[in-house]
Amino acid sequence: MKQIPSVDLGDFLSVDTNKRNEFIQNIGKAYEDIGFVALKGHFLDQDLVDELYAQVREFFSLPYETKSKYEVQGLAGQRGYTSFGKEHAKGRTTGDLKEFFHFGQHEPPTNGEKYPENVLVDESPAFNAVGQKTFAALEKTGCFVLRALALHLGLDEHYFDPFIKGGNSILRAIHYPPITEEPKEAERAAAHGDINLITLLMGAQGRGLQVKNHQGEWIDAIAEDDELVINVGDMLSRHTNNKLKSTIHRVVNPPKSAWHSSRYSIPFFMHPVSDMKLDVLPHCIDKNHPKRFEDITAGEFLEERLRDLGLRK
């Protein structure tokens, strides 16, 4: 496969059974083949997108001394600001060429889950507000994607609903600053797989994001202006015994002629509640597909991966 498939969530939301079933088949096949799709028909409107990017640019343009006030020790980067070069890919020690800011759930979950409070930026109330609105729109979109995948897997359509309601999801605003000197080995984001169930990515409209296909080739993952890129994370891959693929991807450094440019990218990492069991689904195991993963909860898996990323000591 040389490019990621495109699907329209409007087909799944349609009253037309044929369109709905075609969406389920197409997204399921894409996630079995390459683990990525470009999705249109989501719940983000363009005005919200424009406001979000304006506020993200404004925040990252603040002096480091101001931004660093929002880097809270002891949170493993799960809320607020994480400074440049602090996070690295699993199995690497060289930090990625990025800084980022995390938003989590804005209301305390009613299911008893306890998460760190969001870090509010005093200098920009609008940044806090647009983050909350974007979180809600992407969470809603992700819910319907998971409903389609549940049906593809032969599960009840609402199988994932109780696990993602009040889940430990994170909206991450990323700034890849201009490159000022030849990187020795660092990339904007080194090759990695995502931790969570699914990731919904804004900002894949230009070259930079690459996906490794089954032939071991790196292909560009480029979306249209009205599309999100959505990929399978390691939690969902484990749960389905790798039937749905968590594909390795990276953000490569631009050509030298574009070093002076910043890049902004905004992924939404959809996490379940921490006590969700990621045990392999029984009907994803057979003699040709033996169980590949040990039993673990989402919370245990997250802690393990935060240590791998250098965010938890």
Predicted feature descriptions by range:
Residues M1-K313:
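Peripheral, non-catalytic segments flanking oxidoreductase cores
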